[in-house]
């Protein structure tokens, strides 16, 4: 039995009874959200998890992500990915552009997101897995997702309200 199975079942019971919205449990994609070794996806699926994610850290290794997508597809789990190449964003404080330069703040280049969106879409095509790309912020990422959807890949994406309202152009 998965050691968190009781917690997942309790959460599902409480939410089905008390929540005003439908709540679906997610599990970790890699052990400890470290991006190094896959978590026990099969046992989490049996416990009631419907999707897996490494939350805001994202998986930084493409081989681990490929294996994770293959494994998740075996159990019909959706992989939720935070698309950001941390090697390009370390110390970043805001969108890279005129305002970051003017304020003297290290910027987060849109390429840091788009390179992960691209690789995730390629890996989703290779593995036939379902993937959801979280809180995208660039038009380039949206275009990559459009192309993936045109190929009938199981790729979905979303943008956060913060990315729509708090831009450097506002």
Task: List where the protein language model places each region.
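Conserved small/polar residues in nucleotide/adenosyl-binding loops
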Residues: 1-5
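Short, surface-exposed alpha-helical segments at coil->helix boundaries
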Residues: 8-9, 117
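Generic beta-strand or strand-like secondary-structure segments
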Residues: 10-14, 43
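A glycine-rich helix N-cap at a beta->alpha junction
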Residues: 13-28
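Active-site beta->alpha loop and helix N-cap motifs at the rims of alpha/beta catalytic domains
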Residues: 28-34
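Histidine/acidic residue-rich metal-binding segments in metalloenzymes
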Residues: 36-170
């Amino acid at each position: 039995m998965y050691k968190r199975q009781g917690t997942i079942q309790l959460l599902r019971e409480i939410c089905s009874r008390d929540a005003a919205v439908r709540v679906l449990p997610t599990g970790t994609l890699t052990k400890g959200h470290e991006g190094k070794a896959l978590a026990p996806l099969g046992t989490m699926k049996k416990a009631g998890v419907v999707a897996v994610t490494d939350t805001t850290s994202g998986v930084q290794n493409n081989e681990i992500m490929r294996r994770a997508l293959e494994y998740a597809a075996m159990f019909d789990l959706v992989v939720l990915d935070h698309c950001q190449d941390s090697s390009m964003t370390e110390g970043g404080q805001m969108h890279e552009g005129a305002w970051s330069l003017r304020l003297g703040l290290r910027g987060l280049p849109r390429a840091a997101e788009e390179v992960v969106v691209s690789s995730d879409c390629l890996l989703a095509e290779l593995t036939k897995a379902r993937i959801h790309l979280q809180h995208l912020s660039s038009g380039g990422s949206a275009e990559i997702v459009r192309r993936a959807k045109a190929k009938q890949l199981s790729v979905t994406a979303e943008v956060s309200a913060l990315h729509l309202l708090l831009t450097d152009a506002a």
